[in-house]
């Protein structure tokens, strides 16, 4: 008998559990009841960006919800039919625009008509994938699966000021399985440093560190100096384009953190992934799992199991008739496979 209500514990996995569960609730029509939302975080319950995701999801499918308020650790979400259209959402802080978009996008791919979604808030938030990651790494894989999505950055928004905006255009699409076992040949690499309202030497020092540690040619290193009205804000982005995928690694500037240390954080992440031999790094792995499950299958290799990946598996299997298996191929490579249950 089809399960009409899915109950989840949101203590493990943080906001990722909530976002995936909202997407799947909209897609399956199953009521979501979730408790202990972000209970293990320093600021438990729904923050502004989580609340925006809930309210946006409710608008897209005409859901009835209870517990949709700041600080709430309990939520009931009863979805209706998904509706495409023209949507605009404002987080009101530097909360992540990209995480709100990723909550809505799977459902809008199944809408009966196209959608345009504008979201204002933070486009470059250290606790979320920046819009560049979606554009360069995630969306190209979604398009390989058949998803028809375009994404534009209209205005940068850093923490704490926010004020950024993105706009997505989504056509109804049927996703097909994707298998990413290998990266293929390296096609190119580059780095760029965004800086707003900060001295020019900050971006220059970050890129110099990339040159020194990764030996990237200087013509592949680009400082991007934004108008100070967007700031203060700084992020270093490292891109590696391979035959089968592109990966992006980020280092966010912080008060009292030297530019060289910002660069080191992104460089260390990139090196760990490059040395592992796995196809996708941990963040892309986590974000490919839901589209693969909706496609009814797929696989990838990634360096290791993470809390987000594990919690995403748990949520997906609670909603969909799929089985997701993870097995180590070596000390540095984990294979993740998604199968539809007959």
From Swiss-Prot:
Q: Which InterPro entries does this entry report, sorted A to Z?
A: RNA3'-term_phos_cycl_insert (IPR013791), RNA3'_phos_cyclase_dom (IPR023797), RNA3'_phos_cyclase_dom_sf (IPR037136), RNA3'_term_phos_cyc (IPR000228), RNA3'_term_phos_cyc_type_1 (IPR017770), RNA3'_term_phos_cycl-like_CS (IPR020719), RNA3'P_cycl/enolpyr_Trfase_a/b (IPR013792), RPTC_insert (IPR036553)
Q: Which Pfam families match?
A: RTC (PF01137), RTC_insert (PF05189)
What is the active site of this protein?
308
Do you know which PROSITE patterns this protein is assigned to? Answer: RTC (PS01287)
Biological process annotations from GO: RNA processing
Gene Ontology molecular function terms on file: ATP binding; RNA-3'-phosphate cyclase activity
Its EC number(s): 6.5.1.4
Q: Which residues form the signal peptide?
A: none
UniProt-annotated binding residues for ATP: 102, 283-287
UniProt keyword terms in alphabetical order? ATP-binding, Cytoplasm, Ligase, Nucleotide-binding
Identify the GO cellular component terms for this protein: cytoplasm
Q: Where in the cell is it found?
A: Cytoplasm
Its transmembrane ranges are none
What is the catalytic activity of this protein? a 3'-end 3'-phospho-ribonucleotide-RNA + ATP = a 3'-end 2',3'-cyclophospho-ribonucleotide-RNA + AMP + diphosphate
- Function of the molecule: Catalyzes the conversion of 3'-phosphate to a 2',3'-cyclic phosphodiester at the end of RNA. The mechanism of action of the enzyme occurs in 3 steps: (A) adenylation of the enzyme by ATP; (B) transfer of adenylate to an RNA-N3'P to produce RNA-N3'PP5'A; (C) and attack of the adjacent 2'-hydroxyl on the 3'-phosphorus in the diester linkage to produce the cyclic end product. The biological role of this enzyme is unknown but it is likely to function in some aspects of cellular RNA processing.
Family recorded in the similarity comment: Belongs to the RNA 3'-terminal cyclase family. Type 1 subfamily.
Name of the featured protein: RNA 3'-terminal phosphate cyclase
């Amino acid at each position: 008998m089809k399960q009409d209500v899915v109950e989840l514990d949101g203590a493990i996995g943080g906001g990722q559990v909530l976002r995936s569960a909202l997407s799947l609730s909209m897609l399956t029509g199953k009521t979501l009841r979730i408790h202990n939302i972000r209970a293990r975080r320093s600021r438990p319950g729904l923050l502004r960006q989580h609340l925006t995701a809930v309210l946006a999801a409710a608008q897209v499918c005409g859901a009835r919800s209870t517990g949709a308020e700041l600080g709430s650790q309990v939520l009931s979400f009863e979805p209706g039919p998904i509706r495409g259209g023209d949507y605009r959402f404002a987080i009101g802080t530097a909360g992540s625009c990209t995480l709100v978009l990723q909550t809505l996008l799977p459902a809008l791919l199944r809408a009966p008509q196209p959608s345009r979604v504008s979201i204002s808030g933070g486009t470059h938030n250290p606790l979320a994938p920046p819009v560049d990651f979606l554009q360069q790494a995630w969306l190209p894989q979604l398009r390989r699966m058949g998803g028809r999505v375009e994404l534009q950055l209209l205005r940068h928004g850093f923490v704490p000021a926010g004020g950024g905006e993105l706009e997505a255009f989504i056509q109804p699409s049927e996703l097909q399985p994707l298998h990413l076992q290998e990266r293929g040949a390296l096609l190119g690499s580059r780095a760029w440093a965004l800086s707003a309202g900060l001295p020019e030497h900050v971006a220059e020092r970050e890129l110099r560190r990339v040159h020194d540690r990764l030996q990237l040619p200087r013509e592949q290193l680009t400082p991007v100096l934004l108008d100070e009205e967007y700031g203060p804000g700084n992020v270093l982005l490292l891109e590696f384009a391979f035959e089968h995928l592109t990966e992006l690694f980020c280092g966010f500037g912080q008060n009292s953190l030297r530019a060289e240390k910002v660069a080191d954080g992104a460089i260390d992440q990139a090196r760990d992934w490059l040395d592992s031999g796995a196809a996708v790094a941990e963040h892309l792995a986590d974000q490919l799992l839901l589209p693969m499950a909706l496609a009814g299958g797929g696989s990838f290799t990634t360096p290791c199991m993470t809390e987000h990946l594990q919690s995403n598996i748990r949520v997906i299997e609670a909603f969909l008739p799929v089985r997701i298996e993870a097995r180590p191929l070596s000390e540095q490579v984990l294979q993740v496979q998604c199968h539809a249950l007959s």
